[in-house]
Amino acid sequence: MLKEFKTFIARGNVIDMAVGIIVGAAFTSIVKSLVNNLINPLIGLFIGRIDLSNLVLTVGDAQFKYGSFLNAVINFLIISFVVFLMVKAINTFRKKEDKKTEAPSEEVMYLKEITELLKKNKE
């Protein structure tokens, strides 16, 4: 059972996924810092409040902390945009790879040449 587990863990997909999760977590903390320390103060300058996370709407005893929600939305938009750019770059790279592999191999070129010579000899 331990051997099977080692085989499972050693597979590329599991390792790639683990690396992706770790990098994603690190990237999320960078984006949160970007939003909290740079973007929110910039937005706060325009609306007259420096800390958006403290924006609260109080109705009776209920408090709606929409500032924290705005932070989460900004985080989501930035992360989604960066992921979109990464996927777009990967797809562009894959298309270039596909174009490279579409060129016929040397063997195929020789076979075509032989076929053409055989056709000429039959005529």
Swiss-Prot record:
This protein's UniProt keywords: Cell membrane, Ion channel, Ion transport, Membrane, Transmembrane, Transmembrane helix, Transport
Record localization: Cell membrane
Membrane topology designation: Multi-pass membrane protein
One matching Pfam family: MscL
Domain of life assignment: Bacteria
PROSITE patterns tied to this protein: MSCL
Family membership: Belongs to the MscL family.
Subunit structure: Homopentamer.
Name of the protein in its database record: Large-conductance mechanosensitive channel
Native source species: Limosilactobacillus reuteri (strain DSM 20016) (Lactobacillus reuteri)
Protein encoded by which gene: mscL
